[in-house]
Curated annotation (Swiss-Prot):
It comes from Mycolicibacterium vanbaalenii (strain DSM 7251 / JCM 13017 / BCRC 16820 / KCTC 9966 / NRRL B-24157 / PYR-1). The record marks D79 as: Transition state stabilizer. It comes from the Bacteria. Catalyzes the decarboxylation of four acetate groups of uroporphyrinogen-III to yield coproporphyrinogen-III. This is Uroporphyrinogen decarboxylase. Pathway: Porphyrin-containing compound metabolism; protoporphyrin-IX biosynthesis; coproporphyrinogen-III from 5-aminolevulinate: step 4/4. The gene is hemE. It is found in: Cytoplasm. Keywords: Cytoplasm, Decarboxylase, Lyase, Porphyrin biosynthesis. Belongs to the uroporphyrinogen decarboxylase family. Substrate binds at R30, Q31, A32, G33, R34, D79, Y154, S209, H333. GO terms for cellular component: cytosol. Homodimer.
Length: 354
């Protein structure tokens, strides 16, 4: 059942949709994470995978940064490999390493063995979403998933990779196997996001963390059609959709093609390597922008933070003047674990003042 709320006063939802928000909206990727002592206390008793499949922990961890920082959106606590695990792929998230796949996907037979995601396998996620929409008041909840390319990279490499050489070799040299893999992962991503939408999330974001390793030509040929199908399949729910990657300056136009044109508010995330004003010229008309403070800035002392935050807000306003339909303040990537939570709280307050 669709239990989504009406949130007409939400600055986040207003900015994405091209309406004038009451204030500059702000939230931060990985706002629920190791920067928070309350998060570390919970995680000391549970593995990452245990936490991602426990409705009580998902709910509590998602709420922690909203309580502490007063951000304008909550993002569901999860991990991009959760739907892979739920689909039966043997993997774990190893501390200080990341996702590790027990049996990497390297052949056409390996791809054929990938099973669809049954929605019942992510029931704890749906249960947590139902609770969260009842507890968040007027704060919207963002659901998310990893994009097919980034999931494919983890599966083919067997874990994090610097050069993604096996992934690119399959993509370029075994095209039929590659597209079969991307089709299977696109279906899994759609199923995971649909379960979140059906449970009541107010928006979705798709993370293509490793897309920046690709040339524009390769992205358009081997990735864009699959990512576009994710967004096209979810558009009927009517929720705003965001597409984010790291190091994707040359891909911003193509990434906006994937997320726009579906009849719902669309946004593209921008990292700190590209100004928001430049991004506005690269994305399709009708696209909002999210970003783009360098996460490391939050470690550099308050005078540096304040100066950089003001610069991002000003750049966001210039981007809107240049054609972006709205701006949501965020980091260019996730909050670093060493970040002082008080600095995050002060950053949120400063953005709200500007």
């Amino acid at each position: 059942m669709n239990t989504r709320r009406e949130l007409p006063e939400s600055p986040y939802l207003a900015a994405v949709a091209g309406r004038k928000p009451l204030r500059v909206p702000v939230w931060m990727m990985r706002q629920a994470g190791r920067s928070l002592p309350e998060y570390r206390a919970l995680r000391a008793k549970n593995t990452m995978m245990q936490a991602c499949f426990d409705a009580d922990l998902i709910t509590e961890i998602t709420l922690q940064p909203v309580r502490r920082h007063g951000v304008d959106a909550a993002i569901l606590f999860s991990d991009i490999v959760v739907p892979l695990r739920a689909a039966g792929i043997d993997l774990d998230i190893v501390p200080d390493v990341g996702p590790v796949i027990a049996q990497p996907v390297r052949t056409a037979d390996d791809v054929a063995a990938i099973r669809p995601l049954e929605p019942s396998r992510v029931d704890p996620v749906a249960t947590a979403i139902g609770r969260l929409v009842g507890e968040l008041g007027d704060v919207p909840l963002i659901g998310f998933a990893g994009a097919p390319f980034t999931l494919a990279s983890y599966l083919v490499e067997g874990g994090p990779s610097r050069n993604h050489e096996r992934t690119k070799a399959m993509m370029l040299g075994e095209t039929a196997t590659w597209h079969a893999l991307m089709t299977a992962l696109t279906d899994i991503t759609i199923a995971f996001l649909r379960a979140q939408v059906d449970a009541g999330v107010d928006a979705i974001q798709v993370f293509d963390s490793w897309a920046g390793t690709l040339s524009l030509a390769d992205y358009r040929t081997y990735v864009l059609p699959h990512s576009a199908r994710v967004f096209a399949s979810l558009a009927g729910a009517g929720v705003p959709m965001t597409h984010f990657g790291v190091g994707t300056a040359e891909l911003l136009g193509a990434m906006s093609e994937a997320v726009t044109g579906h009849g719902v508010p669309a946004m593209v995330g921008v990292d700190w390597r590209t100004s928001l004003t430049d991004a506005a010229a690269r994305v399709r008309p009708g696209t909002a922008l999210q970003g783009n403070l360098d996460p490391v800035v939050l470690l550099a002392g308050w005078p540096v933070v304040e100066r950089a935050v003001r610069a991002v807000v000003e750049d966001g306003r210039r981007a809107v003047d240049a054609g972006a339909v709205g701006h949501v303040f965020n980091l260019g990537h996730g909050v670093l674990p060493a970040t002082d939570p008080a600095v995050i709280t002060d950053t949120v307050a400063l953005v709200h003042e500007l």
